[in-house]
Amino acid sequence: MKKMYAAALLTAGVLCLTSAVSAAPSQTAAQETVKTPLQQMHMGTSEEKNHRAEIQADYFQHRGERRYINLYNLHVFRQYKEMHGMSLHWGLTVTRPVGSWAEKDAPTVRLDSGAVGVGPSYMVRWTKPLGKKWEASLDLTGGLMVYNKVHPAHTRNYDFMWRIGPRLTYHFNDRNALSIAYLGHHVSNGQRTKNPGYNGVGVSIGYRYTY
């Protein structure tokens, strides 16, 4: 009788052990299923959008009376958002105005206004694809420039710089693209006094890298 009782206990123990081993993988899988959303929350998913960096070089020639200031600009942008054909970019601009201007009371006296400026900039771009390799866009850029001296002469040492115009881009491959634009610009400090705003038109060459 004792032997039969011991055999029954042994059989029951083996069955319990087998059930526990079989249930372990299911519990582990369930735990992993629960952890996955948390891991995605902290680590992000692998399906992240591409980042785009762009560098642009401009040359603008002056337009308007008594304003003889040409611009050489260098911009570096990073795209941070894209939606419905519109993209948003933030960046940095370095500008080198060269030339002079004349006050209204002394139109023949040219005041040297060469300077170097730097400041944050922001670009909004509307893009329309033209096939697999080409795209056309309209760029609108605004920036706050701070100069190493008063610019233009006899005014202030800061300005707002605006650019607008069409751009044509050619994609060499999925990562590299080259563009050219025809832009107009306006520079002004936004004040009622000491604000000889000036305008210009010119070309811009850009290189974009997708990573």
What residues fall within each predicted segment?
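Predominantly the C-terminal beta-signal and adjacent terminal strand-loop region
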Residues: 39-52, 167-211
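Residues that define the transmembrane beta-barrel architecture of outer-membrane proteins
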Residues: 49-51, 66-72, 112-120, 156-162, ...
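Gram-negative (and chloroplast) outer-membrane scaffold detector with strong preference
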Residues: 70-149, 208-210
